[in-house]
Amino acid sequence: PYIFGTQPGRKPVWVFLVQYIRSMKLATFYPRGGTTMVTVTQVAQAVAGAVERNRGGNCYPIGWYNMRWKELLAIIQRYLGVPGRKIITIPDWMFTLAGKRLRKQQQAHHIDGGLNLAKLADIQCAELFIDKSLGCEPLGVLPDDMEKAIGESIKLCVDVMEKRVETVGMRGE
């Protein structure tokens, strides 16, 4: 699942997505598909619920809001000040080609991104949704304001990119 919201002092993982969306001036190009999402508050509730309610070695899929990419991108674009910018769904093969190109660029610079971006298309172009009744509800997770959490994440991404705030990145740099 995608997690939105902010953690004081930490760089959001979504900076790359904001950079990508900002780089496209006339329209946003993105594949079909979508995923499940939770807020940072809901993650904390799920962890607490697992500690307090779980009996035995159970695994719980955590997801509350199932959203297609077009919906997510429309929210992000609103927080970036470009509401209503056209979102164009690209074919899966085009996403695969872009992944192959990026992988070659990474290899040329001796970078191992950790993902085979060409093979990521099968996942990225699917609707990877989770029913909240399978994990969140049994653990006592409550509804939260997903759009607000996305907005907070995007605002912090912009602040990081424009160097208005200092944060620690994912690698602890």
Task: Name what the model sees in each region.
Residues A98, L115-E127:
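Mobile cap/lid helix-loop segments that border enzyme active or cofactor-binding sites
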Residues Q7-P12, I21-M24:
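Loop-centered beta-sheet repeat module
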Residues A44-G114, K132, G140-E173:
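Mid/C-terminal beta-alpha module of Rossmann-like enzyme folds, strongest
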Residues L17-V38, A46:
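A conserved pocket-lining segment of Rossmann-fold NAD(P)-dependent short-chain dehydrogenase/reductase
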Residues V13-L17, K104-Q106:
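Short, hinge-like loop/turn segments at secondary-structure boundaries
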